[in-house]
């Protein structure tokens, strides 16, 4: 094997390992970490709508959301997956299990509401 071929194979192997490692790291996020990564900036750490974007979009409170209050899991799942208005959809970023964990977490936050 020529040195050039060996170098190209080594670069390809390293690139592949980096790519796989980046995907694996995301998959190991706990549910609160998923929420912090994808949701908290707008919805706040506890779902209270006090995130960084509150001034731009004041209706971000998950705790008083009609969908959450009536227990509509399908609607919450759809909003997370497809987005709505200024909220982006996360279908390409979350696998089905992560999506379901975020739906569960949304309702958990509402139950913990003071």
Predicted features along the sequence, with ranges:
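The canonical Cys-X-X-Cys-His
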Residues: 35-45, 87, 102, 106
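Gly/Gly-Pro-rich "capping" loops immediately C-terminal to redox-active cysteine motifs
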Residues: 32, 47-77
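C-terminal capping alpha-helices of c-type cytochrome domains
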Residues: 79-80, 91-114
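Inter-heme linker and motif-flanking segments adjacent to c-type heme-binding CXXCH motifs
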Residues: 25-27, 48, 108-114
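Sec-dependent bacterial lipoprotein signal peptides
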Residues: 1-25
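Electrostatic cytochrome c docking/interface patches
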Residues: 19-36, 71
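Conserved beta-strand positions that form and line the central face of beta-propeller blades
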Residues: 61-62, 86-89
